[in-house]
């Protein structure tokens, strides 16, 4: 399972695109109509087809094909509505759509949908420690992306999203050597932006708190 920031690094998409529909966010009545086709398949077959669609979805992401990735995650959901990875993968795609949105309103919609899908994925999160940790990394990254988006238009909203990202990260810090983790940039970038916000707002105590949490190299850029 790739984390969101790994996938964002891989995916540089042409700016002009029409996002594929995410069926997981359709109204309940429409979802029930779509899911009716599941009754044509035996249980074991449905699970295998769902797992295969997840694999194809991430293969499409590797090829920077967001629309086909979304279609595959939709297919995984149709065969198994409790497949956590269908929601998770769709959430990643929505985050990447936001990175390539044509305007602010479109980007905001994609970001909000990404967060909704992460919330849906949490309902079906397994007990596997590694899966849980990777999910938390991606979930924190989604709040970080939202915070960055709102930095120019609504700094209070940006602060809220950055604090959500930090809150997800804090439990992970107990078991992590941050200097050795490739995903530590999510945490450090979050703290860097909070440091700048609190400095600009004149909140000295909070400014010092987050400044002291940063590596020396990042402090120089403030």
PLM regions: where:
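Canonical tetratricopeptide repeat
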Residues: 89-90, 138, 145, 186, ...
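Alpha-helical segment of the N-proximal tetratricopeptide repeat
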Residues: 46-71, 75-78
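Short coil turns that delineate tetratricopeptide repeat
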Residues: 81, 126-130, 170, 219
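Conserved structural position within tetratricopeptide repeats
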Residues: 77-78, 116-123, 167, 174, ...
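Short coil/turn linking the two alpha-helices of tandem helical-hairpin repeats
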Residues: 58, 96-105, 140, 145-154, ...
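TPR alpha-solenoid repeat register
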Residues: 86, 131, 135, 183-184, ...
């Amino acid at each position: 399972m790739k984390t969101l920031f790994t996938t964002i690094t891989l995916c540089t998409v042409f700016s002009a695109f029409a996002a594929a529909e995410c069926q997981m966010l359709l109204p309940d009545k429409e979802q029930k109509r779509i899911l009716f086709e599941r009754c044509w398949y035996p249980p074991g077959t449905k699970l295998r087809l769902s797992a295969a669609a997840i694999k194809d979805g991430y293969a499409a992401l590797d090829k920077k094909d967001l629309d086909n990735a979304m279609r595959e995650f939709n297919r995984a959901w149709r065969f198994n509505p409790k497949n956590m990875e269908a929601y998770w993968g769709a959430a990643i795609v929505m985050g990447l759509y936001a990175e390539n949105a044509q305007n602010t309103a479109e980007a905001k919609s994609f970001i909000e949908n990404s967060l909704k899908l992460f919330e849906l994925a949490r309902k079906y999160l397994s007990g596997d420690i590694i899966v849980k940790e990777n999910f938390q990394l991606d979930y924190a990254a989604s709040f970080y992306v939202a915070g960055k988006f709102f930095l120019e238009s609504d700094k209070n909203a940006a602060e809220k999203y950055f604090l959500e990202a930090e809150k997800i990260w804090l439990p992970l810090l107990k078991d992590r050597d941050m200097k050795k983790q490739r995903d530590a940039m999510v945490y450090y970038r979050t703290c860097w932006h909070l440091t700048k916000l609190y400095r600009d707002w004149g909140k000295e105590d909070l400014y010092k708190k987050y400044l002291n949490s940063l590596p020396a190299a990042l402090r120089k850029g403030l």
